[in-house]
């Protein structure tokens, strides 16, 4: 009987490096936030929570592992 390769599944959530559309500030955010994530410089909303994966309103530059 063959065992599966991964007994523990990898999480589907990731950290993202995003760029604010209003001011150009780069910030690291979580892909599944529980609260709204705002830009630290101008206060614009970058990610809105939805009970699962958040709605990303900024430009995603990189997906961090």
Swiss-Prot record:
Single GO molecular function: structural constituent of ribosome
Any Pfam family matching the protein: Ribosomal_S27e
Keywords: Metal-binding, Ribonucleoprotein, Ribosomal protein, Zinc, Zinc-finger
ZnF locations on chain (C4-type): 20-42
CC annotations in GO: cytosolic small ribosomal subunit
GO biological-process terms attached to the record: ribosomal small subunit assembly; translation
UniProt-annotated binding residues for Zn(2+): 20, 23, 39, 42
UniProt cross-references to InterPro entries, sorted A to Z: Ribosomal_eS27, Ribosomal_eS27_Zn-bd_dom_sf, Ribosomal_zn-bd
Cofactor: Zn(2+)
Oligomer status and interactors: Part of the 30S ribosomal subunit.
NCBIfam families found in the cross-reference section: PRK00415.1
UniProt family annotation: Belongs to the eukaryotic ribosomal protein eS27 family.
Protein name in the entry: Small ribosomal subunit protein eS27
Species per Swiss-Prot/TrEMBL record: Thermococcus kodakarensis (strain ATCC BAA-918 / JCM 12380 / KOD1) (Pyrococcus kodakaraensis (strain KOD1))
Name of the coding gene: rps27e
